[in-house]
C-alpha cells in the first residue's frame, strides 16, 4: 500500500507542487466541483471583500488544496526523516510544551493543508489520542489508521468509543487532538456563528474542556507565500476559570483565526455551510 501512495507522489514536495499547480489550472478552467464549492464558501466567508479579491482567493485556494492532497500522499509514503525535513519551522512551540500533566491538553485544529502531515508531526513529539472520520474504502482506511499510529499514538474513529477514549486520555493527563471544522453527526453539535452564518458545529471540544478543565491550544500547518515552505503554528493558549465557559462560538472564532492567517491554505472545498440554523437547501446547488 505504501508503494501505491509513493507512485502517486513520486516527486519531492517542491516538484510535486509544480505538478499540482498544473492540475489546478485545468480544474479552474473546467470549473470543477472543487472550484464551485470553494467559490461558494469563500463568497460567504469574505462577503465584505470585493469580487476581485474573492476570485483571486478561489484560484489560490484550489491550487493549495490540490497541493495539500499531494502532501497527504507524500506523508503516507515517506520516512519520518523525510517528513521532518518537510517542515521549515515551528512557531510558539512553548505553548505545546506547557502541558498540564494533571488535566492534559486539547489540541484544536482545522483542515488547513494536510491533516495527516500535521498529525504526523505532533505525534512525533508526544503520544496523542485523536479521532478521525473513516475512509469509505476499508483497505485505505486501515492503512491510514496504522500510519497515523506508527509513532505510538492512538487514533480512533469518530464514534462513541472514540469520544470515550478522548475523555479517558485527558483524565490521564495526556494530549488529545481534533480537527473541529466539519459538520458533526446529528445530535452531536449546536448551531453557532462561523464567518457570519449560524452553522451546525461540534460541541465535543467545549464538552471535553468543561468536564476535564484541560487547556486548549490551536495548531495548524501554514505555508509561506514567498518560499512555499511549510511551517506549524501553535496559537493562543485558552485556559478558563471554573466559572468561565469555552463555547462552540469561542472555538469557531479560534478556527477563523487559524484560517485568516493565510486563507488560501484552508480546504474550502468542504460543504461547511450545508447545515445552517436558517435552512438553505439551495446553497450548494
At which residue positions do the language-model features occur?
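Charged, low-complexity surface patches
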Residues: 31, 111, 137, 198, ...
Amino acid at each position: 500500500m505504501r508503494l501505491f501512495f509513493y507512485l502517486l507522489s513520486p516527486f519531492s514536495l517542491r516538484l510535486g507542487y509544480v505538478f499540482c499547480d498544473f492540475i489546478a489550472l485545468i480544474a479552474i478552467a473546467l470549473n470543477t466541483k472543487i472550484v464551485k464549492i470553494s467559490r461558494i464558501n469563500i463568497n460567504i466567508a469574505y462577503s465584505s471583500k470585493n469580487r476581485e479579491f474573492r476570485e483571486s482567493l478561489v484560484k489560490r485556494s484550489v491550487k493549495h488544496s490540490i497541493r495539500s492532497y499531494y502532501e497527504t500522499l507524500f506523508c503516507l509514503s515517506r520516512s519520518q526523516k523525510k517528513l521532518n525535513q518537510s517542515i521549515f519551522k515551528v512557531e510558539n512551540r512553548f505553548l505545546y510544551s506547557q502541558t498540564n500533566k494533571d488535566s492534559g491538553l486539547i489540541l484544536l485544529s482545522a483542515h488547513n493543508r494536510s491533516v495527516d502531515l500535521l498529525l504526523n508531526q505532533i505525534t512525533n513529539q508526544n503520544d496523542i489520542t485523536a479521532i478521525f472520520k473513516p475512509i469509505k474504502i476499508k483497505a485505505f482506511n486501515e492503512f491510514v489508521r496504522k500510519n497515523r499510529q506508527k509513532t505510538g499514538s492512538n487514533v480512533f474513529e469518530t464514534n462513541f468509543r472514540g469520544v470515550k477514549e478522548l475523555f479517558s486520555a485527558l483524565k490521564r493527563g495526556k494530549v488529545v487532538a481534533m480537527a473541529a471544522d466539519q459538520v458533526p453527526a446529528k445530535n452531536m453539535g449546536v448551531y453557532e456563528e462561523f464567518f457570519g452564518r449560524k452553522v451546525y458545529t461540534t460541541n465535543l471540544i467545549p464538552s471535553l474542556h468543561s468536564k476535564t478543565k484541560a487547556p486548549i491550544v490551536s495548531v495548524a500547518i501554514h505555508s509561506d507565500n514567498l518560499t512555499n515552505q511549510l511551517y506549524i503554528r501553535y496559537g493562543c493558549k485558552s485556559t478558563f476559570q471554573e466559572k468561565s465557559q469555552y463555547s462552540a462560538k469561542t472555538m469557531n472564532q479560534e478556527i477563523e483565526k487559524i484560517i485568516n492567517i493565510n486563507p488560501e491554505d484552508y480546504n474550502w472545498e468542504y460543504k461547511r455551510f450545508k447545515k445552517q440554523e436558517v435552512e438553505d437547501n439551495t446553497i450548494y446547488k
